[in-house]
UniProtKB/Swiss-Prot annotation:
PANTHER family: GMP SYNTHASE [GLUTAMINE-HYDROLYZING] (PTHR11922:SF2), GMP SYNTHASE-RELATED (PTHR11922). ATP binds at S235, G236, G237, V238, D239, S240, S241. It comes from Alkalilimnicola ehrlichii (strain ATCC BAA-1101 / DSM 17681 / MLHE-1). One of its GO terms (cellular component) is cytosol. Pfam families: GATase, GMP_synt_C, NAD_synthase. Gene3D superfamilies: 3.30.300.10, 3.40.50.880, HUPs. Catalyzes the synthesis of GMP from XMP. Residues 208-400 form the GMPS ATP-PPase domain. This is GMP synthase [glutamine-hydrolyzing].
Length: 525
C-alpha cells in the first residue's frame, strides 16, 4: 500500500481570477495536493473535502456591491488556515468585520511592497531591504477596491504608498490576506510565500512528487480495472503517450493501444510512436493506416470547421472499427487532464466565473458499453510532462510543442490534398530541425509551418519556378491565451528559408508570420 498523497490537501476557492489554475500549480509545485472549487460550491462539499487550509483566489467582482461573491461560512468554521489573494483578501476582511471600499486609484502591474516581517507568512521573505531595514517585495498588483479597515484580531503585514493595507494577518488563527498576486512569476518571492503557507502554516508535507504520483496512479489503476482489458487511442501527443506508458507499467499486456495514422501527422511521427511504444517499451499497439480514408473524406472541403468535424468523426469511426474487433475489452482509457474537468457543476448558484466544461473526447457514443479510466484527470499539463519523464518517456516527446488534434488538416489552408500534406511535412521538419540545431526550440512555445494553396514565381538558376508558398509561425506565450510572435534571428530565418526552397521541389517562397495573439490566433485555421 503506497502512502496517501491526498491526505494533506489544500482547497482553492475560485472567485473568477484568470490566475486560479496558476495558484493550484504553484501549490502542487510545492509538493502539496490541491483542488479548485467554485466559490459557491455546496457547503457540504467544502466541509467534506477535509482541507488542511484554504486559498481564496482573486476575481473580477467587488465586495462593495450587495451581491458580491462571499466566502462560504464553512471556510471559517473549519478551524484551519486561510489565505486570501486580492479579491479573496477583500472578501475575507469584509466578512470578518473589516472595511472594504472602492478606490479612485486602481493598481495594475508592478509594485513594491513594504513587508513587515513580524508575521509568520512573510517573515524573512524579501527581494530588497530599505535604508531603514524594512523588507521590500517586488509584486504584481491587479485591483480596484481595497481594504481600508482591519478586521478584529488582524494586524498589518504589508503596505505600499498607494495601498496602505496590502497585507493582513492573524497569526493565531492562521488567517492571511495579500492584495498582490503571489502565484504569478512577476512576484519573484511568490512561490516562497505560498510554500510557507502550505508547509509551515497549514502543516502539509511535500508528498506530491512525481515518484509518489506514479506509485499512487499505478495502484489506483490496478484497483480500478483489476484483471480487465483496457483500450487506448494513442495519438502520439503528450497526454495519450503518458497514459500509455503509465497503463503499461500498471497492467502490462492488459493494455491494447490503437494508433490511427491519418496521413496528417508530422514527418516520421507514426514510426516514432511505434518505435517508442511497440518496440522499445513492448506495448501492444495496433497501427491503422487510414490516410486514404481521411483524404477521401476531406476531398473538396475547404471550411476549417467542417474539416475539423470530418477528421474527428473519421477518427472515431476508424477507432470504433478496431474496438469492435477486440471483444474482450472492458475499459476505454483517455488522456483527460485536470483543466478539462474543472467545470461549472461545482457551482451551486451558477454565478461563479469558472472554466467551461470540456470532455477529452466529444464523440463518445451514448450507448457506449466500455467503462472509462482516466488516470491523469487530477493532473495539470506540466505535471503530466514530469510524470512522463518519471515513466521513462524521451524528453523530446514529453516536451514537444503542441500539435492540433486535426493535425496538418488545419495547417493546410483550404482543401487538404496528399501533395500539400507531403510538402508541408518536409517544410515543417526542416524548421523544427533547425530550431533544435540552433538551441531555439525550447525558447519558443510553439513553432510550425503552414501550407498556403497559392503559387508564386521563383527563380532557380536560369529557370523560372511557379510553385507553392509556406509560412513559418513561432510564438512565445505563458498560457496560450495571448502570445507574441517569436523574434527569431534574421540569419536563422534566412537559413531555414533557403533550405526549404532548395531542398523541397514544389515550394518557391517562404514567409514568416509576425502576428500576435490577439488579434490573430496561433493556428491559422
Amino acid at each position: 500500500m503506497t502512502q496517501d498523497i491526498h491526505a494533506h490537501r489544500i482547497l482553492i476557492l475560485d472567485f473568477g481570477s484568470q490566475y486560479t489554475q496558476l495558484i493550484a500549480r504553484r501549490v502542487r509545485e510545492a509538493g502539496v495536493y490541491c483542488e479548485i472549487y467554485a466559490w459557491d460550491a455546496p457547503e457540504t462539499a467544502i466541509r467534506d473535502f477535509g482541507a488542511a487550509g484554504f486559498i481564496l483566489s482573486g476575481g473580477p467582482e467587488s465586495m462593495t456591491v450587495d451581491n458580491g461573491p462571499r466566502v462560504p461560512e464553512a471556510v471559517f468554521q473549519a478551524g484551519v488556515p486561510v489565505l486570501g489573494i486580492c479579491y479573496g483578501m477583500q472578501a475575507m476582511a469584509g466578512q470578518l468585520g473589516g472595511r472594504v471600499e472602492a478606490s479612485d486609484h486602481k493598481e495594475f502591474g508592478y509594485a513594491r511592497v513594504r513587508a513587515r516581517g513580524h508575521s509568520r507568512l512573510l517573515r524573512d521573505i524579501e527581494d530588497h531591504a530599505s535604508p531603514e531595514g524594512w523588507g521590500l517585495l517586488d509584486v504584481w498588483m491587479s485591483h480596484g477596491d481595497r481594504v481600508t479597515g482591519l478586521p478584529p484580531g488582524f494586524k498589518l503585514i504589508a503596505s505600499t504608498e498607494s495601498c496602505p493595507i496590502a497585507g493582513i494577518g492573524d497569526d493565531e488563527r492562521g488567517y492571511y490576506g495579500v492584495q498582490f498576486h503571489p502565484e504569478v512569476t512577476h512576484t519573484p518571492q511568490g512561490a516562497r510565500i505560498l510554500s510557507r503557507f502550505v508547509h509551515e502554516i497549514c502543516g502539509c508535507p511535500a508528498d506530491w512528487t512525481p515518484g509518489n504520483i506514479v506509485d499512487d496512479l499505478i495502484e489506483r489503476v490496478r484497483r480500478q480495472v483489476g484483471g480487465d482489458k483496457v483500450l487506448l487511442g494513442l495519438s502520439g501527443g503528450v497526454d495519450s503517450s503518458v497514459v500509455a506508458a503509465l497503463l503499461h507499467r500498471a497492467i502490462g499486456d492488459q493494455l491494447t493501444c490503437v494508433f490511427v495514422d491519418n496521413g496528417l501527422l508530422r514527418k516520421d511521427e507514426g514510426d516514432q510512436v511505434m518505435a517508442t511504444f511497440a518496440r522499445h517499451m513492448g506495448v501492444n499497439v495496433i497501427r491503422v493506416d487510414a490516410e486514404a480514408r481521411f483524404l477521401e473524406a476531406l476531398k473538396g472541403v475547404d471550411d476549417p470547421e467542417r474539416k475539423r468535424k470530418i477528421i474527428g468523426n473519421m477518427f472515431i469511426e476508424v477507432f470504433d472499427e478496431q474496438a469492435a474487433r477486440l471483444t474482450e475489452v472492458d475499459w476505454l482509457a483517455q488522456g483527460t487532464i485536470y483543466p478539462d474537468v474543472i467545470e461549472s457543476a461545482g457551482s451551486a448558484t451558477g454565478k461563479a466565473h469558472v472554466i467551461k466544461s470540456h470532455h477529452n473526447v466529444g464523440g463518445l457514443p451514448e450507448d457506449m458499453t466500455l467503462k472509462l479510466v482516466e488516470p491523469l484527470r487530477e493532473l495539470f499539463k506540466d505535471e503530466v510532462r514530469r510524470i512522463g519523464l518519471e515513466l521513462g518517456l524521451p524528453a523530446d516527446m514529453v516536451y514537444r510543442h503542441p500539435f492540433p488534434g486535426p493535425g496538418l488538416g488545419v495547417r493546410i489552408l483550404g482543401e487538404v490534398r496528399k501533395e500539400y500534406a507531403d510538402l508541408l511535412r518536409e517544410a515543417d521538419a526542416i524548421f523544427i530541425e533547425e530550431l533544435r540545431a540552433h538551441d531555439l526550440y525550447d525558447q519558443v512555445s510553439q513553432a510550425f509551418a503552414v501550407f498556403l494553396p497559392v503559387k508564386s514565381v521563383g527563380v532557380t538558376g536560369d529557370g523560372r519556378r511557379y510553385e507553392y508558398v509556406v509560412a513559418l509561425r513561432a510564438v512565445e506565450t505563458i498560457d496560450f491565451m495571448t502570445a507574441r510572435w517569436a523574434h527569431l534571428p534574421y540569419e536563422f530565418l534566412d537559413h531555414v528559408s533557403r533550405r526549404i526552397i532548395n531542398e523541397i521541389p514544389g515550394i518557391s517562397r517562404v514567409a514568416y508570420d509576425i502576428s500576435g495573439k490577439p488579434p490573430a490566433t496561433i493556428e491559422w485555421e
